[in-house]
């Protein structure tokens, strides 16, 4: 595996890479989901949709949660390049993915035989350093790839099923990977009241495009909130994570997504493939009702997953 890299992917690096491997390879081909489609292997054991482990040892909880749904080798083939997307929007307690959860996923990927592990972001280095995530990534020999917030480094992707969002701008660096692991922290949001697996994919989309999700009065107007949630659901139709690992150990339930805010501590790590089901489960941790989160309903309507937890097999464990 390559050594640690924590630098901006800038214009010079992009031009150099384009000349070296060809612009088509950098841009990728087809819909984004085709890159990681089929990366989930058939699991012959008991079928579990969502694995949940409760405990204060977040590193071990993450491993055990993934084991509940078939183990990391079900999702990460040998010699694959793995893209990881933690939430590092801020550094206040309960607003970012815990370093030990990210460390655990990196180590599982290494044991599965991944040849390259890349943590992707267009957020500033300060966020990664202040949360302790940069140090963990360096210690574990993974790569931190920070992409400049310039249109040059993002690829336009049409959204055929989009109702509100017709085109996304996905970071080109993402296309150099074989497997995508989505690693949000579940928490409050000022507009739609919930951040989880589906909303975390905005971390791959160009910030200017993300701003179009937010209409005037997006924090208070029902129509504007529905527009935000529809854009998020639309974005999810062209990006399909192989695995979602959610930090629900502690998270803010007020003043999200940046914080600081009131913190709830369920001490849970939640994993699964079905984003809609995982988000449906996570919102129950602080009593949010189905009808209050349009994004989950819209994701279900897009056929992205199951929102009725009575139809989902959940296995929980305490350590």
Predicted feature locations:
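N-terminal and secondary-structure boundary signal
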Residues: 2-319
């Amino acid at each position: 595996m390559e050594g640690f890299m924590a630098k901006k992917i800038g214009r010079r690096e992009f031009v150099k890479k384009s000349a070296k491997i060809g612009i088509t390879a950098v841009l990728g081909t087809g819909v984004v989901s085709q890159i990681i489609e089929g990366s989930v292997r058939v699991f012959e054991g008991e079928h579990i949709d969502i694995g949940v482990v409760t405990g204060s040892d977040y590193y071990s909880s993450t491993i055990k949660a993934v084991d509940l749904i078939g183990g990391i080798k079900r999702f990460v083939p040998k010699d694959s390049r793995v893209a990881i997307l933690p939430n590092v929007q801020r550094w206040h307690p309960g607003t970012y993915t815990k370093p030990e959860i990210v460390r655990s996923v990196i180590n599982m990927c290494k044991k599965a035989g991944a040849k390259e592990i890349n943590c992707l972001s267009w957020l500033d280095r300060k966020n990664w350093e202040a949360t302790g995530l940069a140090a963990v990534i360096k210690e574990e020999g993974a790569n931190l790839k920070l992409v400049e917030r310039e249109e040059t480094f993002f690829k336009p992707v049409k959204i055929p099923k989009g109702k509100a969002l017709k085109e996304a701008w996905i970071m080109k660096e993402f296309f150099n990977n074989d497997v995508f692991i989505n690693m949000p922290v579940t928490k409050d949001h000022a507009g739609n009241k919930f951040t989880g697996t589906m909303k975390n994919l905005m971390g791959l989309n160009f910030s200017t495009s993300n701003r179009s999700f937010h209409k005037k009065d997006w924090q208070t107007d029902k129509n504007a909130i529905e527009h935000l949630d529809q854009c998020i659901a639309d974005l999810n139709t062209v990006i399909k994570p192989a695995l979602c690992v959610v930090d629900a150990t502690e998270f803010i339930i007020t003043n999200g997504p940046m914080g600081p805010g009131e913190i709830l501590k369920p001490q849970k790590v939640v994993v699964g493939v079905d984003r809609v089901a995982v988000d449906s489960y996570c919102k129950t941790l602080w009593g949010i009702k189905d009808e209050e989160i349009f994004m989950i309903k819209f994701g279900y309507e897009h056929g992205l997953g199951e929102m009725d937890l009575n139809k989902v097999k959940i296995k929980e464990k305490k350590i």
